[in-house]
Regions:
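Glycine- (often His-adjacent) and acidic-residue-rich active-site loop
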Residues: 52-88, 104, 132, 217, ...
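Hydrophobic helix-cap positions at the C-terminus of alpha-helices
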Residues: 35, 39, 89-92, 195, ...
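Acidic-histidine catalytic/liganding microenvironments
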Residues: 7, 42, 92-93, 235
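A general structural signal for well-ordered alpha-helical segments in protein cores
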Residues: 29, 63, 82, 142, ...
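Crotonase-fold acyl-CoA enzyme core
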Residues: 87-201
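C-terminal alpha-helix plus adjacent terminal tail
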Residues: 1-11, 161-167, 182, 186, ...
């Protein structure tokens, strides 16, 4: 589900549901949130890297579980869940680096808004498929994306549900560096080790002063998005999209 490894004060969290393209189900939300909480409190961890196993970074929310949750909301409920994971990401006090090794969809793309540095494989792609699923944005992306990439780029990403290439993500400022696939993790960890060599209290002070002013705005954006999401989830467009996804998945098995 989630692999955790340490090297030179750098903790790497590897999303490990490769058969599901590392889609987030309740168990993975829980594992990721708990791993971040543990890393935040560990005096031997200076930097956290998040990456994915296999050919995907993360395919986003597990749509099969999402459809099941519409009819039975408590069936797959976890300890932390999606929103608690967002709280933990927003409050994470140490440098957080994402290494996008493959496709990143939904939260697999919007999680980059919480990264202090993002590296991306040259053959990876990103997508925010909210309009194709008939739902609203998530993870404060309606606030964080315009800050990262500008209003018009953010509008295109969030409204079009189109793929964004690594080159486009770099040009927009959504990621910091694009690497060859075979060099992604090495390059990510090389930079992570530079940060990890610095005093942890100083790293945390830099991050706090940069991110503390954003926390209330992130919380407000999530509240707005959640209200819109609640209106749209299970509505005609969303139900049709989820049904099509489930039918397609079953026909491919």
């Amino acid at each position: 589900m989630l692999n955790v490894s340490d090297d030179n004060r750098v903790r790497t969290l590897t999303l490990n549901r490769p058969a599901a393209l590392n889609a987030f189900n309740e168990a993975l939300y829980d594992s990721t949130a708990q791993a971040l909480l543990t890393a935040a409190d560990d005096p031997d961890v200076a930097v956290v890297v998040i990456t994915g196993a296999g050919r995907a970074f993360s395919a986003g929310a597990d749509l099969v579980e999402m459809q099941a949750n519409i009819t039975n909301p408590r069936e797959n409920a976890g300890q932390h869940g999606f929103f608690r994971m967002l709280d933990v990401l927003s409050a994470f006090p140490k440098p957080l680096i994402c290494a996008v090794n493959g496709v990143g969809v939904g939260i697999g793309a919007t999680i980059l808004g919480y990264a202090d540095l993002a590296f991306m494989s040259s053959d990876a792609r990103l997508k925010c498929p909210f309009t194709s699923l008939g739902v609203a944005p998530e993870a404060a992306s309606s606030f964080l994306l315009p800050r990262q990439v500008g209003r018009q780029n953010a509008a295109w990403i969030l409204m079009s549900s189109e793929w964004i290439t690594a080159a486009e993500a770099l040009e927009m400022g959504l990621v910091w560096k694009v690497c060859e696939p075979t060099e992604l993790l090495a390059e990510t960890k090389r930079h992570a080790n530079v940060l990890a060599s610095k005093p942890i209290p100083s790293l945390m002070a830099v991050k706090t002063t940069m991110t503390a002013p954003l926390r209330p705005q992130i919380d407000a954006a999530i509240e707005r998005e959640t209200a819109c999401f609640a209106e749209l989830i299970g509505a005609a467009a969303n139900a049709a999209a989820l049904s099509e996804f489930t039918s397609r998945g079953q026909s491919e098995e």
